């Protein structure tokens, strides 16, 4: 079963992206994505949607 999660910028804290992941995975998602507020690519970490 997949759950919806938000990806939050590690620098400014904006929730810029929403995606899904498997519920049975223990580790959280951490992706390098573009942040429009910071105007650069930053690490985005998983948070509750």
Curated annotation (Swiss-Prot):
Report any Pfam family annotated for this entry. Ribosomal_L33
Keywords attached to this entry: Ribonucleoprotein, Ribosomal protein
**Entry-linked HAMAP family:** Ribosomal_bL33 (MF_00294)
Q: Look up keyword Nucleotide-binding and say if it applies.
A: no
Q: Can you say what this protein is called?
A: Large ribosomal subunit protein bL33
Mind telling me which NCBIfam families this protein's record contains?
A: PRK00504.1, PRK00595.1, rpmG_bact
GO biological process terms, alphabetically, are: translation
Q: What is the lineage of its organism?
A: Bacteria, Thermotogati, Thermotogota, Thermotogae, Thermotogales
A single GO molecular function term of this UniProt record: structural constituent of ribosome
According to its record, what are the GO cellular component terms? cytoplasm; ribonucleoprotein complex; ribosome
Asked if the keyword Chloroplast belongs to this entry, the reply reads: no
Q: Where are the transmembrane segments?
A: none
| Gene (UniProt) | rpmG
Q: Which residues form a coiled coil?
A: none
Q: Which family does it belong to?
A: Belongs to the bacterial ribosomal protein bL33 family.
